């Protein structure tokens, strides 16, 4: 993410001296459509609900409502986090959060779905800004906040075309064809 053309805060970035995170390599998972992406996401959450704290971080409340409904249909209760709540890192279960509300919190597994062009960055935010490059940089900073919430597993997903905010190549995460995981 910090290798994106839109990242403009290199002076604020502190590179780690060593990699201390445990768990699988971060993953960027591609799907053909939204339905496949949701099926995979719900399946992953169901598999780890009893053993880890899981958060799904979304761009907006409408997406949170959609995912809460999809999880509920599969018998999974998800708690919606607001920005004034305390951390949940040691509490097993499923949480839904916006980028803003996740700031300062940590979870064992972090899922960030719908990182496809058209959904992320938020087109309304970009189009209403006088300075589009600055608006894109702000959207990228929100994503950076979400990325840094994980203590163990970190999974990003999208369907269709990947957001322009991502660098065209990166060695920081593995790219996976999600259709093979269904």
Positions of predicted regions on the chain:
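Helicase P-loop NTPase motor core
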Residues: 1-80, 86
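Structural motif
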Residues: 32, 58-62, 99, 115-116, ...
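Short, contiguous acidic/charged loop-to-helix segments that flank catalytic cores in large enzymes
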Residues: 59, 84-86, 129-135
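A short acidic (Asp/Glu
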Residues: 65-69, 107, 166-168
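Conserved helicase ATPase core of P-loop NTP-dependent helicases/translocases
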Residues: 87-92
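A short beta-strand element within the Helicase C-terminal
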Residues: 93-125, 155-156
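C-terminal accessory regions
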Residues: 115-182
